[in-house]
Amino acid sequence: MAGVGDAAAPGEGGGGGVDGPQRDGRGEAEQPGGSGGQGPPPAPQLTETLGFYESDRRRERRRGRTELSLLRFLSAELTRGYFLEHNEAKYTERRERVYTCLRIPRELEKLMVFGIFLCLDAFLYVFTLLPLRVFLALFRLLTLPCYGLRDRRLLQPAQVCDILKGVILVICYFMMHYVDYSMMYHLIRGQSVIKLYIIYNMLEVADRLFSSFGQDILDALYWTATEPKERKRAHIGVIPHFFMAVLYVFLHAILIMVQATTLNVAFNSHNKSLLTIMMSNNFVEIKGSVFKKFEKNNLFQMSNSDIKERFTNYVLLLIVCLRNMEQFSWNPDHLWVLFPDVCMVIASEIAVDIVKHAFITKFNDITADVYSEYRASLAFDLVSSRQKNAYTDYSDSVARRMGFIPLPLAVLLIRVVTSSIKVQGILSYACVILFYFGLISLKVLNSIVLLGKSCQYVKEAKMEEKLSNPPATCTPGKPSSKSQNKCKPSQGLSTEENLSASITKQPIHQKENIIPLLVTSNSDQFLTTPDGDEKDITQDNSELKHRSSKKDLLEIDRFTICGNRID
């Protein structure tokens, strides 16, 4: 009977249809009775059915709800993982931005150092070579009757410009003697700190406006004085332009003197509050520049403006130190008192420029290699100004590119030096002569080093073709077609020979009815005056269309120095 019961139990458990599990439960309950009390009852067995797994899952779910705790949450947060390689391009771009920001200080300072030495070269030219060139031009003018009037021109155009610069420099220097520096110092010192801060900001804006318009006045004077006589008179005359240039240089020199006086008052203040406020003004410049959209040309213009501003600040600090040393009878101990303030002003200027350029390049996706292009463009100006037939003098080229006009600053520095240093006795005059020869040596050495570096930068940027491709000649009075205006490459000399052979040569005088071959230096072209081809294009197009923007760095000059937009 026990064997029959054991055989029937599986049949009862497995013979069911829909209610198989219920019948299986009954079979398990009937097994002890079916054994008839013979032997110990077998151990209960759990059959692997779907209902068992469902109940186990419900049991685990109920246990999971009851066991939710802060420890399990913290454990999940600490062990949760993620994979950055799913967004590899994004993180690679962010890493390159960090590397670009780290490269900005080095590349920017290399550009700044090169640009400052360019400004120094143009500034030393006024004190060293310009007086010698004026002397040679006057000597030619006085000795011209001895050689006869073989040429229709009494002087070369460059000599006329040199004489005009020298006369303007001398006249403005004597006019500056009527401005009392001591009275201006005490007048500014009696003002409140906030008023002086406002005055200093107004002076910075006025300096930019003067620099933007001043070179136009000087260029108009140079062109009016050297314009060929055959052309139709379309100007007011040389004398009015000359008086305008003298008035501009005099007013700009007074403006820079007020800036230097305000800075001197800040240095001599007891609590240094004014100096701190003036330094904080540099950090306000970050707010006005960082959050604007910048293109490469806009950044190039702003870099040139920063170079000019930094060099001007160095000269202002030199003037402040000279005035303070004069007041303390040239006591060298007082120089160490001024030294921390001078270093603080220079360090704040450098820090502001680095932060400003770093975030501008970050927000506008500009690489750090763009500063090498800017440096090559400045080097191109220097090399092209030393060519056999250059468009303009190098100092004027720097003025057009950066907005740095050396004449007003030179007038003020001469005025301060002559009033601060008294020359008495033969030994003092001998020291002055030796100092002048030292300036000439410094100018020559600086020019040689800059010229060598500039040729290197031009070759690295592969810009030699622009130096060796002069424009095609055309006779005046006849309109040239577009095909005739295309530049033809020069033959007979290689690029390296052109760079080495054409530098430091004097221009050859040609006939007036033939336009000479000039080096294509686009830096001296005015943005406001289109060429003949551009005039034809604008006449064919509608009047509502503006001229296309010039994207070549060599075509960007200082005409938009007061703003950030390049037309």
From Swiss-Prot:
Alphabetically ordered keywords of this record: Acetylation, Cell projection, Chondrogenesis, Ciliopathy, Cilium, Cilium biogenesis/degradation, Cytoplasm, Cytoskeleton, Developmental protein, Differentiation, Disease variant, Host-virus interaction, Membrane, Osteogenesis, Phosphoprotein, Receptor, Transmembrane, Transmembrane helix
Outcome recorded upon mutating D353V: In OCLSBG; causes mislocalization of the protein in the cytoplasm; impairs cilium formation
Residue numbers carrying Phosphothreonine: T529
Keyword Ribonucleoprotein part of the UniProt annotation: no
Keyword Lyase found: no
UniProt topology in membrane: Multi-pass membrane protein
Modified residues (Phosphoserine): S523
Protein name, as recorded: Transmembrane anterior posterior transformation protein 1 homolog
Species in which this protein is naturally found: Homo sapiens (Human)
Gene name in the database record: TAPT1
